[in-house]
Amino acid sequence: MVDRALADPAVRRALVPVVFGDGPTFERRATLRRLPVVAPGTALPPEGPARVAVTELPARDRAPGKPTTNGGKAQLAYVTAAVDSALRGEVDALCTAPVSKEQITRAGVRFMGHTELLAEAFGREVLMLMDGPRVKVALATNHVAIRDLPRSLEKSRLAAQLQLLSASLQPVLGRRPRIAVCGLNPHAGEGGLLGDEEIRTIAPAIALARRRGVDCTGPWPADGLFARPDHMPADVVLAMFHDQALVVAKALDFERTVNVTLGLPVPRTSPDHGVAYALAGKGKASATPMIAALLKAAQLASPRGRASRRATSTPRPRA
């Protein structure tokens, strides 16, 4: 999937890729795609045809479609190496391929996802945004069990997320974005009959964000808000939990919706799908999501994207 995406003409015009992964495996795939590969450490041209630098990491299990403990360790090693490179200022953006949280955890490391790892590595408060052609929806919580959602929502944090979302999109839109905020419960709580998180937490957070200059409304019942995505009275939605956001984003445009991490000093994007082990090594997986993620990373690394990040990179408070 990665090799096919990097061979795409639009991607080759847009960026110079540096691949963090298993060298021999990628070199073999790159040869099939006629992608030029340069040795690790070789200076890459700032312009011209895209070239690929393969980072040498210890060889791991190379059995496509077969999850292994060593494979989990390798996935984490590749992600960590890419993040370290970004921290050193060696790359302008990060585009992460899917990894298996289960296999990484089985390898002995509790891994909740790229977004959480990046927040910790950069020491920033971040926000996950599913950026699609028809709807943009951010997540107030990421990988949180349903039973833990009520205590995961906090007024000041929600207000800060709304500020981050507004500041991130304003340079792109040229104005303050209109943000619609979902409720947590069915029918946004129905006035407290179906839960009171909207009354106790979400509505006060919206009021606080509005006092800070954010154009936001809600809490709205999610089913009604997403019923007509092409006529939504907002530029972006803040959803309260993972599936409230991702079901809509994937249903509307699975292949072209990109996962963007807001709040980092460098852009980070990812395709909106998982590892798909059943398709690994068969050439059947669509490269369109990875192409979309790569092009979005290049766009966010542009001067306008850099201006947006300068306005939104907020250090996380030290404990």
Residue spans for each PLM region:
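Ligand-binding beta-strand-loop-alpha-helix segment within the catalytic cores
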Residues: M130-A160
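Conserved hydrophobic/aromatic beta-strand scaffold that supports enzyme active sites
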Residues: L117, M128, V137-L139, R268
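Glycine/threonine-rich beta-strand-loop-alpha-helix active-site module
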Residues: T105-M128
